[in-house]
UniProtKB/Swiss-Prot annotation:
Enzyme Commission code(s) on record: 2.7.1.170
GO biological process, one term: peptidoglycan turnover
Described purpose of this protein according to its UniProt entry: Catalyzes the specific phosphorylation of 1,6-anhydro-N-acetylmuramic acid (anhMurNAc) with the simultaneous cleavage of the 1,6-anhydro ring, generating MurNAc-6-P. Is required for the utilization of anhMurNAc either imported from the medium or derived from its own cell wall murein, and thus plays a role in cell wall recycling.
A single GO molecular function term of this UniProt record: kinase activity
InterPro entries: Anhydro_N_Ac-Mur_kinase, ATPase_NBD
Leading EC class: transferase
Species per Swiss-Prot/TrEMBL record: Prochlorococcus marinus (strain MIT 9211)
Catalytic activity: 1,6-anhydro-N-acetyl-beta-muramate + ATP + H2O = N-acetyl-D-muramate 6-phosphate + ADP + H(+)
Similarity comment: family membership: Belongs to the anhydro-N-acetylmuramic acid kinase family.
Residues annotated for ATP binding in this entry: 9-16
Key word Nucleotide-binding present: yes
Keyword entries, A-Z: ATP-binding, Carbohydrate metabolism, Kinase, Nucleotide-binding, Transferase
Pathway: Amino-sugar metabolism; 1,6-anhydro-N-acetylmuramate degradation; Cell wall biogenesis; peptidoglycan recycling
Protein name in the entry: Anhydro-N-acetylmuramic acid kinase
Length: 379
């Protein structure tokens, strides 16, 4: 089946789209990417999304106009990726602007902006969307959703495999080996903490939005990190909490950046960005170290995906702190960096049609595995 997958992450960079074909066993499908596109949001739309997600005041009219603009942008991206309209369905994540994990007796909640009926009409095909709500309703974290999909797309090897997504938030998937005592272990995954979100916000704030991210890590490269601050931050409650766990800009956003800026003993932009970059790498390394201490699991391979994989400073710092693992870009196994997440949501849409559960207790803490997503048709 031909399926479109569309994704925009917490960094609000734009929309990545793939046109893929899936056949065979849904647990280990045969798949190929026919086409892929990436479209950056125009600066005014990107800033509106960030402002809304940071809690800035929006009228009802402004919210409707924002949701229409996002939906129309998704439609443009879909038509660009599939100009002949061969896809039968589209799996569309929508634009995340709020994510609240469950806490105690309070269930979690997540908001992805998308007018799915409008999108279905604009692209004239069935749209599967709202993938997180059912997991949350069943007591899960609602994120991350990609670990089961990573396992299906990438498969197992002789040891544990890890896939690290460096979006606004860093999340990790762990795929058990194909043989040995861990063969029957479940796929694991969780949100580690900030990857790009604090770095991007710092760059935007310090450059008055002339820059939106640290291109090629050049700002961080020329800075001196505050390791005392990093060590202090790594002891915060979220980083000590075991999985399942999820997070977002609500926890690691502008207010969090401002708090951290008061705790750094260096005031220059390059030192701030360097500190935040190494902090992101340390968060990931600490989680993998804790995984080994608690479960005796140490991946032999770590594939890195997402926009942060294109930051050579962040990539290098992760490599330095993950010794004993073969650390490489996910592009080396045939999945382009920007295609990995839209490919997983294309697969999740296919799974929805097949009535195959896309969530797992071992990953999100959901009470039972569930088929994810909601269908809307163009007619």
């Amino acid at each position: 089946m031909y399926v479109l997958g569309m994704m925009s992450g917490t960094s609000a960079d734009g929309v990545d789209t793939v046109l893929a074909e899936f056949t065979g066993n849904p647990d280990q499908p045969q798949w190929r990417i026919i086409n892929s596109t990436s479209h950056e949001y125009p600066n005014n739309l990107k800033q509106a999304i960030i402002d809304f997600g940071q809690g800035c005041s929006f009228s009802s009219q402004q919210f409707i106009e924002l949701s229409e603009a996002i939906t129309e942008f998704y439609a443009m991206a879909a038509k660009s990726c599939d100009p002949k309209g061969i896809a039968l369905i589209a799996g569309c994540h929508g634009q995340t602007v709020f994510h609240r994990p469950p806490s105690g007796a309070k269930r979690g909640s997540s908001l992805q902006i998308l007018q799915a009926p409008l999108l279905a009409i604009l692209i004239d095909k069935t749209v599967i969307y709202d993938f997180r709500s059912k997991d949350l309703a069943l007591g899960g974290q609602g994120a991350p959703l990609v670990p089961l999909l990573d396992a299906a797309l990438i498969g197992a090897c002789t040891g544990w495999r890890a896939v690290l997504n460096l979006g606004g938030i860093a999340n990790i998937s762990l795929i058990p080996p194909r043989s040995g005592p861990d063969k029957t272990s479940p796929v694991l995954g969780w949100d580690c903490g900030p990857a790009n979100t604090l770095i991007d916000l710092a760059v935007q704030q310090r450059t008055n939005h002339e820059l939106y991210f640290d291109h090629d890590g050049l700002i961080a490269l020329n800075g001196s990190p505050d390791f005392d601050a990093i060590e202090q931050w790594l002891n915060e409650p979220f980083f000590k909490k075991p999985p399942p766990k999820s997070t977002g800009r609500e926890q690691f956003g502008l207010k969090d950046l401002e708090r951290r800026m008061t705790q750094i003993n260096r005031s220059s932009t390059k030192d701030l960005v360097s500190t935040l970059t190494i902090f992101s790498a340390c968060v990931i390394a600490q989680d993998l170290h804790n995984l080994y201490k608690s479960k005796m699991i140490k991946p032999i391979e770590l594939f890195i995906a997402g926009g942060g994989s294109e930051n050579p400073v962040l990539f290098r710092e992760i490599q330095l702190r993950c010794r004993g693992m073969r650390v490489r870009s996910i592009g080396e196994i045939g999945i382009p960096v920007k295609s990995r997440e839209p490919l997983t949501f294309a697969l999740l849409a296919w799974w929805h049609l097949l009535n195959k559960p896309g969530s797992s207790t071992a990953i999100t803490g959901v009470s039972k595995g569930a088929v994810l997503g909601v269908q809307v048709h163009p007619n």
